[in-house]
Amino acid sequence: MAMTVEEQKKLERSLIERGKTDLAALDDGFEIARLLGDHEIGNEIRKLAMEHLRKGGGADATMLYHRSLIFDGPMNFDCFMRALEFNRPVNEQFWLPRRKQLMPISNALQDMEDGKLDELFLSQPPRTGKTTLMVMFLLWIMGRNSERSNLYCSYTDSVVGVFYNGLLEILNDSYTYAYGDIFQTKIASTNAKDLLINLERKKRYASFTGRSLYGTLNGACDCNGYCIADDLHSGIEEILSADRLKSAWDKVDNNLIPRLKMGAKMVWEGTRWSIADCIARRIDLLENDQKYVDHRWKVVNVPALDENDESNFNYSYGVGFSTEYFQQRRASFEHNNDMSSWYAQYQGSPVERNGMVFEPGGMRYYNGVLPDGEPDRKFIAVDPAYGGGDYTAAPVVYQYGDDLYIVDVVFDNGEKNVTQPQLVAAVKKYDV
């Protein structure tokens, strides 16, 4: 007579309890969990398997641990990544050396797929693993449901091509990666020219489509899975141009976002360059428009240095970046008088919040002779300093029509007992 589900659950629990001292019983308990489709017990099984391994359980304990990861991999992103690279030397793996630091991002991505979030914004310093993590995430998503159409977009075709090749490397290299052990999906077709990957069958809208923001988006993808917007801005030169910022956002709002069907999820990742960049504009909309009051979204920003000036990315096995490394990078930016770029690229704080950088070629100059007549307006704009070597900056401005003339400036890194009298003197001198 067959056992009921309730009886099987009781036997499962009994075997796992015995499994604390008996590896064979733990293995039997896992097999029942697998037959029941019980993914709630996986962490407990793996912890016990590790205890047996520490006590000399050898290959049997290792194999049980691995089988448990493979079983839970389709349901759990963290387990998927651990199972995917299980056969690689740990120092060559992507995920395990970085797992502790990147787990908040992994958890947020898990929440997306579990239906707890609709939209996610990610920011972290260069070369800390954000794009590789997104490659693994999209492979997990494609394995879970190959019928979904997913879209990846970046500012240039070359970046999209690197992402496409990253997906294919893992899908094709069964010696290094155990993707085929976790998902029994097969590649149906690829297209390197159009950056398309189909799993299981060739579809009108591929399992993966890659496009640059300035490429052909209309008609290329009918995204009902995930849209990944990765580094939509090319760098500081673009950020310094209001026209280029607006052009990028117009492409996003008119060409990219309309490719998403209802229910599709969106992940934004990249440098928080400006309060007018694409990520900032989208966040502003979600924060301030009542039409999005029920939209579930989250921002995860992991800066290079924490509040104690220590590295957040000191990964194991020497694959990360030490506190000294980031402090040296900061010193280089400081030496070049470009701290705004440091804050944007490494701390996730837009340049305007830390002193916008202007290109000299974008400034207009005059010969010291002002237009005839009294100015329409005179004012002084003060950016005070709060210590730490920062400068008080206060240009004295005369306005004639739409033109602004800077006739003088207070710029000093002294304490307030030095700068306050300078400000008072400027106010009196120019009657502002």
Name each region found by the language model.
Residues 240-310:
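ASCE P-loop NTPase helicase motor core
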Residues 309-382:
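ATPase catalytic-site recognition across NTP-hydrolyzing enzymes
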Residues 1-117:
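N-terminal accessory segments
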Residues 207-211, 375-387:
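Two-metal-ion RNase H-like nuclease active-site motif
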Residues 116-137:
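Walker A/P-loop
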Residues 192-254:
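Conserved RecA-like ASCE ATPase "motif II neighborhood" in helicase/translocase motors
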